[in-house]
């Protein structure tokens, strides 16, 4: 009755004890049980694997093969604090896509980024976030969405270890931090279709993508 379209099974599973094959196998077992229960009620719901992505782990192929056709997406949580975050994440996304297609050339599994993480909320984090957004745009429909953490942070009362709130608040005030405004700009000027573009003479210092509306009535540059 709530119109839920996507459900992630868990969050950052098989992370805290390292790369353990038995924990990946246990995750697959639990995923399958929940898959059958959810799909039995609503076959249209898209399910998301949240097993921690480790591209070099032998458990990745085994987990992928066990969930291929059941998980629509694999949740990937990159670090987004650095100026090079966009380039690094784009390389990892391309590797993920390459591995998926190597393991099954006909797979429909794709990626979703439900958390871009970091420990800052300043202009450097803005640049990490927006270059990561450009990386996602260049990946086309392989990546469903990318979400910057965290949404809220109580001013001088934060006790969860993360210092990356987009919106700070007190009992009487609410204000956005720089990443909030970058996200606001991206949402306000979203266009669904990517346009090919290139940069010359910038010595690699500019990261640029372009998108347009379906009717081709407007083009947005992300620089």
Regions found by a protein language model. Give the residues of each.
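Noncatalytic carbohydrate-binding groove/subsite architecture in carbohydrate-active enzymes
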Residues: 19-133, 139-142, 194-205
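Aromatic- and acidic-residue-enriched carbohydrate-binding clefts of CAZyme catalytic domains
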Residues: 1-17
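Short acidic, glycine/proline-rich loop/turn micro-motifs
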Residues: 17-20, 159
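Asparagine-centered strand-capping/turn motif at beta-strand->loop junctions
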Residues: 221-223
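Aromatic/acidic polysaccharide-binding cleft in carbohydrate-active enzymes
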Residues: 109-218
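Short, solvent-exposed loop/turn segments at the edges of secondary structure
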Residues: 2-4, 69-71, 106, 162, ...
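Residues that line or immediately flank small-molecule/substrate-binding pockets and catalytic motifs
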Residues: 11, 78, 150
